[in-house]
């Protein structure tokens, strides 16, 4: 969640695969909350996974504090659980995956692709493997 854009991703119903959905322009907080409320109403997620911009040394800096403050506004208006995930290197990983797949920034914006990376990391960590060798 940046100062200008918010990348949004969704998982499939089985919570196996995350895909980029959309990017939202970050206007004033009220308008941004309204846009996220509309997405939540449409897609009805079980929870929101929000990327937290932790500093390289692992500390919570000013940008992470902004994200937490905005998330507080979201939690007041939504009846949806919010989980924070470290978003360090998610944009780099998203760009690598887009390059590997032949997609470029015109096809999928970095922000939405990074949101999918963050969500996929959460899904991989919380869902046990479906198949055992």
From Swiss-Prot:
Pfam families attached to this UniProt entry: RuvX
Any Gene Ontology biological process: rRNA 5'-end processing
Enzyme class: hydrolase
Function: Could be a nuclease involved in processing of the 5'-end of pre-16S rRNA.
GO molecular function, one term: nuclease activity
Cellular component GO terms, alphabetical: cytosol
Name under which the protein is recorded: Putative pre-16S rRNA nuclease
Gene3D superfamilies in UniProt: YqgF/RNase H-like domain
UniProt entry keywords in alphabetical sequence: Cytoplasm, Hydrolase, Nuclease, Ribosome biogenesis
HAMAP family to which the protein is assigned, alphabetical: Nuclease_YqgF
CDD domains named in the record: YqgF
InterPro entries listed in its UniProt record: RNaseH-like_sf (IPR012337), YqgF (IPR005227), YqgF/RNaseH-like_dom (IPR006641), YqgF/RNaseH-like_dom_sf (IPR037027)
Major localization listed first in the record, in broad terms: cytoplasm
Protein's cellular compartments: Cytoplasm
Enzyme Commission number: 3.1.-.-
Recorded family membership: Belongs to the YqgF nuclease family.
């Amino acid at each position: 969640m940046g100062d200008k854009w918010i990348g949004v991703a969704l998982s499939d119903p089985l919570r196996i695969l995350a895909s980029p959905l959309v990017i939202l322009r970050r206007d004033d907080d009220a308008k941004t909350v309204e846009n996220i409320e509309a997405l939540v109403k449409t897609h009805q997620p079980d929870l929101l996974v929000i990327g937290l911009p932790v500093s390289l040394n692992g500390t919570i800096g000013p940008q992470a504090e902004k994200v937490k403050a905005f998330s507080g506004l979201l939690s007041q208006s939504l009846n949806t659980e919010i989980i924070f995930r470290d978003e360090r290197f998610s944009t780099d990983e998203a760009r690598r995956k887009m390059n590997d797949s032949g997609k470029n920034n015109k096809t999928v914006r970095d922000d939405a692709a990074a949101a999918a990376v963050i969500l996929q990391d959460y899904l991989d960590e919380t869902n046990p493997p479906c198949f055992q060798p």
